[in-house]
Amino acid sequence: MAARWRRILIVFVAAQVLCLVNTFEEEDVPEEWILLHVVQGQIGAGNYSYLRLNHEGKIVLQMQSLKGDADLYVSDMTLHPSFDEYELQSVTCGQDIVHVPAHFRRPVGIGIYGHPSHQESEFEMKVYYDRTVVQYPFGEASYNPEEMEANQKYSHSTEDESQDEESVFWTVLIGILKLILEILF
């Protein structure tokens, strides 16, 4: 009877150890994500810490609040994003994730805010390059901001060139007609 209880106790302890190990194990990330940087820091309550992102392409910012609560604000318009001025944000208690699209202008401003509910917050942010290829359900006809911007620049330049050519043509034609009218009259 004692041997049976001993086996049950050993199985129970082993299960507890496995659960404990799994909770401390690194979080799984997709194979397509390549780790570029790991940034650790501390931030006081109500303060900001600013970082700059220069890497091109799709970037994933994964921040874990180790102590306290740090929030994440991202912008391609300003290098000092805040809770008043940002394009992307993640303000959860614990893990914050922001996906920075490839079309964002570089450098991208990253603001880390220490929530006032804690005197000091500690964070660890992992910066990943996302190599996933997006499959658009409508193929080439789908919206691609980078391609649209390039096409708009091309169409504006061809319109400007044709307007310039027309303008020069009409200027020369009017000049010749004025010359003919002066000679005749």
Swiss-Prot record:
One of its GO terms (cellular component) is extracellular region. This is UPF0669 protein C6orf120 homolog. Belongs to the UPF0669 family. PANTHER family: UPF0669 PROTEIN C6ORF120. It comes from Gallus gallus (Chicken). Residues 1-23 form the signal peptide. Keywords: Glycoprotein, Secreted, Signal. The keyword Glycoprotein applies. Pfam families: UPF0669.
